[in-house]
A protein has these predicted regions:
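GIY-YIG nuclease catalytic motif and its immediate N-terminal context
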Residues: 1-69, 74
Length: 74
């Protein structure tokens, strides 16, 4: 099973955050910056990668993404 990444992108300090998962972090960040990533990132101008975690198994990355999305925002 291929590995995966959980990542967070933003548009600036105290800005909008996007949390995602991918098998190829470099290609995914490049796609977001070129406006080819998610519609949410394109709409909010999210081009800065601020956090990334690598996993040996994509299923572990997906589980981590789901857990992080349950975090409370403050």
């Amino acid at each position: 099973m291929p590995g995966g990444w959980v990542y967070i992108m933003t548009n600036g300090p105290h800005g909008t955050l996007y949390l995602g998962v991918t098998a190829d972090i470099a290609a995914r960040v490049h796609a977001h910056r070129d406006g080819q990533g998610s519609e949410f990132c394109r709409k909010h101008g999210l081009t800065r990668l601020v956090y990334a975690e690598q996993y040996e198994d994509i299923h572990d990355a997906i589980a981590r993404e789901k857990a992080m999305k349950r975090w409370k925002r403050q």
